[in-house]
Regions:
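Short aromatic-glycine-(Arg/Gly/Cys) micro-motifs in beta-strand/loop hairpins
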Residues: 1-13
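Short, mixed-charge low-complexity intrinsically disordered segments
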Residues: 31-55
């Protein structure tokens, strides 16, 4: 699985989505936030050490 970082425009919250590809990650992000914006892909270490919520 890959880790994708997003930011929600409405709340300003940054969060991670664990998914197979960016399309799946967007679907998951939209399930939890109204207006998510993709930032970048991070590796396993960055995801674990970021302290961000992961969906």
């Amino acid at each position: 699985m890959r880790h994708f970082m997003f930011e929600d425009y409405d709340t300003g919250e940054e969060f991670l989505v664990c998914a197979c590809d960016i399309e799946e990650a967007f679907i998951i992000a939209r399930d939890y936030f109204a207006d998510p914006s993709y930032i970048c892909e991070v590796d396993e270490f960055e995801a674990e050490s970021s302290g961000l919520d992961e969906y």
